[in-house]
Amino acid sequence: MASPNGGVTTYDYDDSDSAAPVRAQTIEELHSLQRKAAATAKDSASPLQSISASLASTAREYGPNLVKGDPEAKGAPPAPVKHQQAAAAAAIAASDSSLKFTHVLYNLSPAELYEQAFGQKKSSFITSTGALATLSGAKTGRSPRDKRVVKDDTTAQELWWGKGSPNIEMDERQFVINRERALDFLNSLDKVYVNDQFLNWDPENRIKVRIITSRAYHALFMHNMCIRPTEEELETFGTPDFTIYNAGEFPANRYANYMTSSTSINISLARREMVILGTQYAGEMKKGLFGVMHYLMPKRGILSLHSGCNMGKEGDVALFFGLSGTGKTTLSTDHNRLLIGDDEHCWSDNGVSNIEGGCYAKCIDLSKEKEPDIWNAITFGTVLENVVFNERTREVDYADKSITENTRAAYPIEFIPNAKIPCVGPHPKNVILLACDAYGVLPPVSKLNLAQTMYHFISGYTAIVAGTEDGVKEPTATFSACFGAAFIMYHPTKYAAMLAEKMQKYGRTGWLVNTGWSGGRYGVGNRIKLPYTRKIIDAIHSGELLTANYKKTEVFGLEIPTEINGVPSEILDPVNTWTDKAAYKETLLKLAGLFKNNFEVFASYKIGDDNSLTEQILAAGPNF
């Protein structure tokens, strides 16, 4: 504003946007000012000794020279850390790798990992919603035939080997050879990504895991999928209980013993280590750790489960078991209930707990209308794996299968609005076994006694329809023991015995819910409507079905309710929905025969310490 002052006009200038020049002589100094220093705990060198020990060669018995931070960062380099045994061993095991420093990027934030991913691979992009879209390379799914578990004196007796088992053996020597191959690759890099995180939300039974990988996207994936530690927890993290060496960018030697391809996923339970070679599919890390939990938790008397889990407002918890396509994720995600987890859980004397800190959702044909929670979770921090997007707008086309049908999104569970944090709950009230029966002969819902629950849990049944491209329309039965045979370590009857013990101890109810077909098999009948299935699940949660009237079906001997609010009574007994009763009986007997044939491999095993329970379970199958 102008004002007279002795004939001189003065002005009050608005200089609110003026400031002193920056205290920087170069653009690098300006950039360093832009990034405020992290907390002192993150700058501590204390984890480097432990990480160097993790990266130690078995032959040389010492780890690489490590320095914390990005080698491309400007400014004074951090002080290097050498493994404490390096000086003594260097004289006898000198190598070029011992003369260089490996930079450790330790527990980076999502924003930092985004920047690393963009600088590292041409296949990393930001989508229109802020997610990180990336590619897993030639492998777009797990490679179960390339997974190996070390068979030693202990595991030879403990683990499930042979027909039907997912555990394919290798010896300790070949594991060490593959471990050295992975370490040589990782230690040759200028930088590696290291995550120290936890598994299991139950604080009394959590496991410390360390993931060492060459790709930023893998580090972000595990940041999302494992439980994220606080700064205080990182300061006292110490030595991990289990370590993953992900050298998936480097191939295995296909001509080595026990190898069948250039891909190899190896687990040594004695060493508490996992080695990945020749595959960059991130799901190998997630499911590898799940297998480890299937080994470690039962040793503590804790049942590990491949299931979804949610909790009602009154604290009533339900477990959902089911193979792919049965509706496990859809039905466990309920806006009227809190989500404890969508895939991996533990059941201990403390109740249930989620193993993971995130969700790994399928994205194929994803829509906002059908799966709003997953749709909205795909935002900044989420990893989108192998999706296709518009080159200009970066909008994802979830229907596009050009790369793979197994498109995935990995995000922290906090991205789901009704997630229960911490992800723990009381003992389950209901155990729900889901089956998508494409034969159309199982009832929409059946109440199971204990023996029937164990029989169907061990069977792990669903049915799929062959692809139309080969002209086959006959349904194919799929059996996966404990609804997760690919990941279990012990014989299925061990997990069944633990489930039976907990259901008896806490008085829980088992249910078999068919989310498949009614009125005929696939191609003849119709898929049971999702609203009807939701009404059935609601009736289970509310306790309505505990007081319902029941009748027993033939062959399978299942107890089915005569009526449920909101569900047509005529569909509750599958025989009523078939116009061709003879075809129904023929199909029913066919499925019963498939169940019997599948269960023969388990018939000679004792389930728990109760001989009578074993006999009851064997008698709980179809009778014809």
Curated annotation (Swiss-Prot):
Pathway(s) where this gene product acts: Carbohydrate biosynthesis; gluconeogenesis
Tissues expressing this chain: Green leaves but not in roots or etiolated shoots.
EC number: 4.1.1.49
GO annotation, cellular component aspect: cytosol
Domain of life: Eukaryota
Keywords linked to the UniProt accession: ATP-binding, Cytoplasm, Decarboxylase, Gluconeogenesis, Lyase, Nucleotide-binding
Pfam family, one: PEPCK_ATP
Catalytic reactions on record: oxaloacetate + ATP = phosphoenolpyruvate + ADP + CO2
Keyword Nucleotide-binding assigned: yes
Gene Ontology MF terms: ATP binding; phosphoenolpyruvate carboxykinase (ATP) activity
Region of interest: Disordered: 1-22
InterPro entries: PEP_carboxykinase_ATP (IPR001272), PEP_carboxykinase_C (IPR013035), PEP_carboxykinase_N (IPR008210), PEPCK_ATP_CS (IPR015994)
Entry annotated with the keyword ATP-binding: yes
Cellular compartments annotated: Cytoplasm
GO biological process, one term: gluconeogenesis
Chief location category: cytoplasm
Binding-site list for ATP: 322-329
Subunit structure: Homohexamer.
Family membership noted in the UniProt record: Belongs to the phosphoenolpyruvate carboxykinase (ATP) family.
Protein name, per record: Phosphoenolpyruvate carboxykinase (ATP) 1
Organism whose genome encodes this protein: Urochloa panicoides (Panic liverseed grass)
